[in-house]
Amino acid sequence: MVKAAVLYEVGSQLVIEDVELDDPQAGEVLVKVGAAGICRSDRHFMHGDAPIALPVVLGHEGAGTVEAVGPGVTSVKPGDQVFLSFVPSCGRCKSCITGNSHLCDNHGATGPNMYDGTTRLHKGDQRIHHMGKTACFAEHAVVPET
């Protein structure tokens, strides 16, 4: 269980509560969140100015410490300090391998779930979405390696 700030409905306050966080899967990393920025984007989602799947843990700018890695993760290890961003990069396309990860051919996959279409956050049977695959308005976050 981790504490997280969950948005259940547009126009409402964030609810700070315990939620379940699954272990990282292949290509994923568990991060203990040390800091999270509050961005105008978070407010847009909260106020309904932009659509988002609910319920959701917001927060797409953060920093923390890697606590665990899933199978196949090679770029970070437990104890590493990392920055969390909602602009994911695949690390494999031409843009990524030439140092232009901000132009990633696959970055359009910034939806509310992990790359496999599931979530790592839930409360009982109710899944909770990850804003931009980061969801750093929580004590811990499971994020893609890249």
Over which residues does each language-model region extend?
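Extreme N-terminal starter segment of soluble prokaryotic enzymes
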Residues: 1-3
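Short Gly/Pro-enriched turn/cap motifs at secondary-structure boundaries
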Residues: 20-21, 53-59, 128-133, 139
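Short N-terminal binding/cap micro-motifs at the start of the first secondary-structure element
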Residues: 12-16, 40-41
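Glycine-rich beta-strand-centered segment in the early N-terminal region that forms part
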Residues: 22-36, 46-97, 102, 110
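NAD(P)H dinucleotide-binding glycine-rich loop of Rossmann-like/cofactor-binding domains
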Residues: 92-146
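Short loop segments at secondary-structure junctions
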Residues: 10-11, 67-72, 146
